[in-house]
């Protein structure tokens, strides 16, 4: 392939990647967005809770809810 055609092909590839949503992984972007059922926690969690992350209320034990904090989504007691 001639050197003059390499640059247009490269530009075309970059433009196609941007049209598809860029370089970011769509699943990673979906995880960073809050689920409609997960709300911001009312209180600051204890530091040990940051080791036990959750994705939904089903991941938590009884009398606990999954809520969003500075360290991610954690299970916190509702009592």
Swiss-Prot record:
InterPro entries in the cross-refs: Elafin-like_sf, WAP_dom
Disulfide bonds listed in the record: 41-67, 50-71, 54-66, 60-75
Domain of life, per lineage: Eukaryota
Full protein name: WAP four-disulfide core domain protein 10A
GO cellular component, one term: extracellular space
Subcellular location as annotated: Secreted
Protein encoded by which gene: WFDC10A
MF GO annotations: serine-type endopeptidase inhibitor activity
PROSITE patterns the UniProt entry points to: WAP (PS51390)
UniProt key word Magnesium: no
Record Pfam families: WAP (PF00095)
């Amino acid at each position: 392939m001639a050197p003059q055609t390499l640059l247009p092909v490269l530009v075309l590839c970059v433009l196609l990647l941007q049209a598809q949503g860029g370089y970011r992984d769509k699943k990673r972007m979906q995880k960073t967005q809050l689920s409609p059922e997960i709300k911001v926690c009312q209180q600051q969690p204890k530091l040990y809770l940051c080791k036990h992350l959750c994705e939904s209320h089903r991941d938590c034990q009884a009398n606990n809810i999954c809520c969003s904090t500075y360290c991610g989504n954690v299970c916190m007691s509702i009592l």
